[in-house]
């Protein structure tokens, strides 16, 4: 009896194991190794546009110094019989390298206009020269033609200013001796603009006093101070290596037939000069 119960228990246990083995079982979640996971596709980010590097501004090359030449205005005027009654030759400045010296164009244009004006004046003088010739012929007097010669020199030039000094010599019929005239111009070295007295000096009264004192002292004109003061004209100046040069025209003072000049150093005029 015991044996039957034992067998029954064993059978029941085996049956239970069998039923457990045959019953449904949960499949475990498949484990996925990290390498098997699909790599996330990176989201497309907009490409950053490169910031353009500003190119450095080109530094303009400094203007070259003027290369000086000359422009000549010349003509010979004759009477009806072919006799020369007037001869003129005006040699004026010409900047040859206007491509490298921008001021040169304006300077050249100024002197071209000056030369043209001189030629117009010469045509007017021609009529008087012919009249003088006719009178001389009728009276049996010797006749000498009038001649005019103009030359120039570059008196001063630096990065700021250019000064031109001109001389005009006139030998006229009936004159005891040739007449000499002095002219001058000062230009802005960068633009070629012609600069007058007020563009170079700041105090006309002080400049006049110093210039008059210089003429009186240098030429012993103590008794003619008033005449010097009246004769002085502010636009009659130019620059030189030694300083500012001022002049009086010939014939403006007793016994003075040709231009006279005085030079005031740059140091002595520093307080009344725009350019120091």
Regions found by a protein language model. Give the residues of each.
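Compositionally biased intrinsically disordered regions enriched in Thr/Gly
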Residues: 23-276
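C-terminal motif of bacterial Sec signal peptides marking the signal peptidase cleavage site
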Residues: 18-21
């Amino acid at each position: 009896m015991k044996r039957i119960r034992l067998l029954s228990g064993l059978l029941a246990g085996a049956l239970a194991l069998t039923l457990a083995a045959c019953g449904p079982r949960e499949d475990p979640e498949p484990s996925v190794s990290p390498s098997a996971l699909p790599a996330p596709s990176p989201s497309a980010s907009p490409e950053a546009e490169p910031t353009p590097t500003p190119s450095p501004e080109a530094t303009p090359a400094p203007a070259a110094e003027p290369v000086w030449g000359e422009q000549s205005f010349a003509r010979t005027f004759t009477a009806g019989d072919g006799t020369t009654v007037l001869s003129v030759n005006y040699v004026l400045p010409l900047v040859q390298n206007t491509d490298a010296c921008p001021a040169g164009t304006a300077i050249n244009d100024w002197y071209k206009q000056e030369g043209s004006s001189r030629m117009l004046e010469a045509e007017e003088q021609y009529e008087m020269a012919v009249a003088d010739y006719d009178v001389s012929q009728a009276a049996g007097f010797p006749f000498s033609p009038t001649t005019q010669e103009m030359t120039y020199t570059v008196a001063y030039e630096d990065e700021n200013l250019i000064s031109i000094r001109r001389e005009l010599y006139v030998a006229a019929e009936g004159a005891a001796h040739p007449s000499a005239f002095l002219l001058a111009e000062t230009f802005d070295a960068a633009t070629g603009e012609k600069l007058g007295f007020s563009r170079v000096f700041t105090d006309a009264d002080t400049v006049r006093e110093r210039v008059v004192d210089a003429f009186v002292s240098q030429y012993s004109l103590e008794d003619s101070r008033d005449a010097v003061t009246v004769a002085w004209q502010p636009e009659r100046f130019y620059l030189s290596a030694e300083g500012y040069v001022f002049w009086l025209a010939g014939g403006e003072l007793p016994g003075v037939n040709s231009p006279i000049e005085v030079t005031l150093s740059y140091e002595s005029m520093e307080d009344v000069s725009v350019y120091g």
